[in-house]
A protein has these predicted regions:
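Hydrophobic faces of well-ordered beta-strands that scaffold small-molecule active sites
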Residues: 59-61, 84-87, 104-111, 135-137, ...
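An active-site metal/cofactor-coordinating segment within enzyme catalytic domains
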Residues: 1-55
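Active-site beta-loop-alpha junctions enriched in small/polar residues
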Residues: 5-6, 29-31, 64-66, 89-91, ...
Length: 175
């Protein structure tokens, strides 16, 4: 199924862990909107979502890294390998060693926490080892000066993605 959370409570009319329910039970639930209001929509399988999105949008599969071998099989089956973004905060050498076979077939976007003391080294590793088209950064406070350093380090090499869904990811700012 396509589910962001490990629990059903926030995004569906169900309760409890996703892993504790059958596919039939989950398919019977309804999705909730951002205000937690029940909608008419059902929980799709990943395959259904890929087919629906095919040719329309890119999909950010930010929770799929640990299952990417399985996910990739679906991407090939649905012809959507060029429509997804695979993300991870794993070290660049680990990504290259374990997922290198996918890096020319899908967009890979590393995630780097700029509050980490090794952030710039991690960025350099990614730029040297993987050469991503973009990098997602997060940082907790505007007092962090690394967003300025990142801009210079990445100029002409890769795009910058700041996730502004929560203020804890973008220096206290959100959408």
């Amino acid at each position: 199924i396509l589910m962001h959370d490990s629990k059903l409570d926030r995004t569906t009319t169900g309760k409890g862990l996703v892993a504790d329910h059958t596919l039939a039970e989950i398919k019977a639930l309804q999705l909730r909107n951002g205000c937690h209001i029940k909608t008419i929509y059902k929980v799709p399988t990943l395959e259904e979502a890929l087919l629906f999105a095919k040719g329309r949008v890119m999909l950010n599969l930010d929770k799929a890294f640990d299952y990417f071998d399985q996910v990739y099989t679906l991407l090939e089956k649905t012809g959507t390998t060029d429509m997804v973004i695979m993300k991870s905060d794993a070290p660049a050498d680990y990504v290259k060693k374990n997922y290198g076979k996918y890096l020319k077939k899908v967009v890979f976007m590393p995630k780097i926490n700029l509050d980490d003391k090794n952030a710039m080294q991690r960025l350099d590793d990614y730029l040297q080892i993987i050469n991503p088209v973009a990098v997602e950064f997060k940082f907790a406070s505007d007092l962090n000066r690394l967003p300025y350093d990142v801009k210079n380090a990445m100029k002409g090499r890769a795009r910058i993605w700041y996730n502004t869904l929560w203020n804890t990811h973008a220096g206290g700012h959100d959408d």
